[in-house]
UniProtKB/Swiss-Prot annotation:
Pfam families: DUF1922. Coiled coil: none annotated. Signal peptide: none annotated. InterPro entries: DUF1922, MTH1184. This is Protein MTH_1184. The lineage of its organism: Archaea, Methanobacteriati, Methanobacteriota, Methanomada group, Methanobacteria.
Length: 71
């Protein structure tokens, strides 16, 4: 099980449930237990999709796509 949360910089992240900390790309070490949880996912693929959607809601589309999803 994975949980989805945000860093103080605003970036959406995911981590395994039970993990104590997670390192954000901004350099901060985030204490997972103190974060507001935005969602839960059963596997890492579902978690990464939820993170991608949260990022697009906040910052807009980045135009990077998975090659298997191109039409």
């Amino acid at each position: 099980m994975y949980i989805i949360f945000r860093c103080d910089c605003g970036r959406a992240l995911y981590s395994r449930e039970g993990a104590k900390t997670r390192k954000c790309v901004c350099g901060r070490t985030v204490n997972v237990k103190d974060r507001r949880i935005f969602g839960r996912a059963d596997d890492f693929e579902e978690a990464s999709e939820l993170v991608r959607k949260l990022q697009e809601e906040k910052y807009g589309s980045c135009h990077f796509t998975n090659p298997s999803k191109r039409e």
